[in-house]
Design a protein with these regions (language model features):
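Solvent-exposed beta-hairpin/edge-strand motifs
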Residues: 366-383
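Glycan-recognition surfaces
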Residues: 112-146, 150, 192-299
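Carbohydrate-binding surface patches
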Residues: 281-284, 289, 328-369
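Active-site groove signature of glycoside hydrolases
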Residues: 59-71, 152-181
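Acidic/aromatic-lined carbohydrate-recognition and catalytic surfaces
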Residues: 62-126, 201-207, 212
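The substrate-binding groove and active-site-proximal loops of carbohydrate-active enzymes
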Residues: 25-40, 68-78, 134-150, 177-191
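Carbohydrate-recognition beta-sandwich/jelly-roll modules
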Residues: 1-57, 91
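C-terminal beta-strand-rich structural cap/linker in extracellular carbohydrate-active enzymes
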Residues: 387-408
Length: 408
């Protein structure tokens, strides 16, 4: 009963995938560059982090940054991939890469599978009522087919030769889709097929940090982290979307090592939206930025990065442990989140999704604090200090956030 109450019953049976390092801070190319990703731009972003962010508090407690290539990396030669990894290492970074193991984006049934001569893609699709299963513009493939394992082996060998240590595995739900049948006759459900495929993924990629995206929640023990809100960008609606997922999914950092709030994008947003989006990241889990920091990227977004990604006290919050909502019975997205740390400090964040100022009063006991004691507060974006006893009076500007460090 105690494990269930602490949201850890599943973790007792299937513990999270091991990870003895700090929560990842970093960059992912899909936030802005997307298919405009090139080898020179990737090097420039790595250099920008080294020269401008890593020495200004944008590093995890291991003093590392994870610099990730998303979709589009396959335009690089193998030599360029290796050189990118080497540049990252020289810059005090871990290189990351991307793959979608359970999809066929070409949707060309007659295409030959080069990993296993004699097979075509039509041989590995998952079929429902005789038709290929399609989702998000891609056909789903059978995780139990030997050709899919051959692809995993080949891709893993490339990633390891290049030296990648982090991989984002995307569109994983395709591997869990239901089908008329699977290559392995013992598989009878989509999740059984997905679990089979994840065992293979662990076999070939298990020594890398694995981050899942667009994936089933369970089974959870094959990856260190899972994205809880996909395609969250820069606006307040993206922050609200992320925090809606955190409201109901905060507990997933008990079955994964960390939650993933998606890339933090700063471009074309107000100062308040920037503060809110960064805060939504640090209170959720891994802390990955996504703007174009190459030489061709805008001066404005680089200035924003220097302003909003380098707040030492904000960044120190990001230890990988998710905040949880203060309330859970609202009709709209929750906007108050709290975390109690082992050293006795509490953190309390209030988001304002609206276009007008928000004023509210919060009872300290609702935050798990002793209402008979007086607490010292510091709002970490403004640096303003105050005290509170019994209740906390909060004012949040339109489309903005405040986050307090609370100590006795």
């Amino acid at each position: 009963m105690k494990a269930w109450k602490n949201t850890q019953a599943n973790a007792v049976i299937a513990p999270p995938k091991a990870w003895d390092k700090a929560v990842p801070f970093g960059w992912n190319s899909w936030g802005a560059l997307q298919f405009n990703l090139t080898y020179p731009k990737a090097l420039e972003v790595s250099d920008f982090y080294k020269e401008n962010l890593q020495s200004h508090h944008f590093v995890n407690s291991d003093n590392l940054v994870y610099t990730g290539l998303d979709s589009g990396w396959n335009s690089f030669s193998e030599e360029e991939l290796k050189a990118f990894v080497d540049r990252c290492k020289a810059n005090g970074q871990i290189a990351g890469v991307y793959w979608t193991p359970f999809t066929d984006w070409a949707k060309n049934p007659e295409r030959e599978i080069k990993e296993i001569p004699g097979y075509k893609y039509k041989d590995v699709y998952l079929y429902a009522n005789g038709k290929p299963q399609e989702l998000d513009g891609a056909y789903a493939v059978d995780p139990t087919h030997p050709a899919i394992e051959a692809m995993m082996k080949r891709t893993s060998e490339l990633f390891h030769r290049a030296g990648f240590e982090y991989v984002k595995m995307d569109f994983m739900t395709h591997g869990a889709m239901e089908a008329d049948k699977w290559y392995n006759p013992e598989i009878q459900t989509g999740i059984q097929g997905y679990n089979y495929g994840m065992q293979l993924l662990d076999k070939y990629f298990g020594d890398m940090y694995i981050n899942l995206s667009i994936s089933p929640v369970f089974p959870a023990h094959y990856a260190q982290s899972r994205r809880i809100a996909c395609d969250a960008w820069n606006k307040m609606k993206d922050t609200e979307y992320t925090l809606n997922a955190l409201s109901y999914g905060w507990w997933q950092d008990k079955v994964y090592q960390f939650n993933d709030p998606d890339h933090i994008v700063l471009r074309d947003a107000t100062d308040g939206e920037n503060r809110a989006r960064v805060t939504s990241g640090v209170i959720t889990g891994i802390f990955i930025a996504g703007d174009d920091f190459s030489k061709g990227g805008s001066k404005e977004v680089k200035e924003k990065a220097m302003k909003y990604l380098t707040n030492a006290e904000i960044n120190a919050i990001a230890n990988g442990e998710s905040f949880h909502p203060v309330d859970g019975n609202g009709e709209k997205s929750e906007n108050q989140f709290v975390r109690m740390d082992k050293d006795g400090k509490a953190y309390y964040a209030v988001f304002n999704y609206m276009d007008q100022e928000l004023k509210m009063t919060t009872a300290l006991e609702r935050l798990g604090l002793d209402s008979s004691k007086e607490y010292r507060l510091k709002e970490l974006w403004s640096g303003i200090e105050s005290t509170a006893k019994t209740n906390l009076e909060v004012t949040v500007p339109a489309c903005d956030v405040v986050i307090f460090k609370v100590e006795e």
